[in-house]
Amino acid sequence: MNQSAQNYFSVQKPSETSSGPYTSPPPIGYPTRDAVVGDPPAAAVETNSKGVNPEGCCAAICCCCVLDACF
């Protein structure tokens, strides 16, 4: 047998219906702009302003002073 006759493969032209280069899908869980049928509607998120908290600021300064003294 002739080995060169056995070692070949065929190449087919891509279909003409493709609209452009293939791009991979986004990772699982990555939000997309398109809504999929069966997805639950997104709930509205309400945020509340907590205002200025002087105790938190004082605690942060105290923590920095303690860490500075320890190291």
From Swiss-Prot:
Transmembrane segments: 48-64
Expression (tissue specificity): Mostly expressed in stems, siliques, roots and flowers and, to a lower extent, in leaves.
Cellular compartments annotated: Membrane; Nucleus
Keywords, ordered alphabetically: Membrane, Nucleus, Transmembrane, Transmembrane helix
Subcellular location, principal: membrane
Signal peptide limits: none
Membrane topology: Single-pass membrane protein
Region (Disordered) residue spans: 1-35
Function: Involved in resistance to abiotic stress.
Family designation: Belongs to the CYSTM1 family.
Record's protein name: Protein CYSTEINE-RICH TRANSMEMBRANE MODULE 8
Organism for this UniProt entry: Arabidopsis thaliana
Underlying gene: CYSTM8
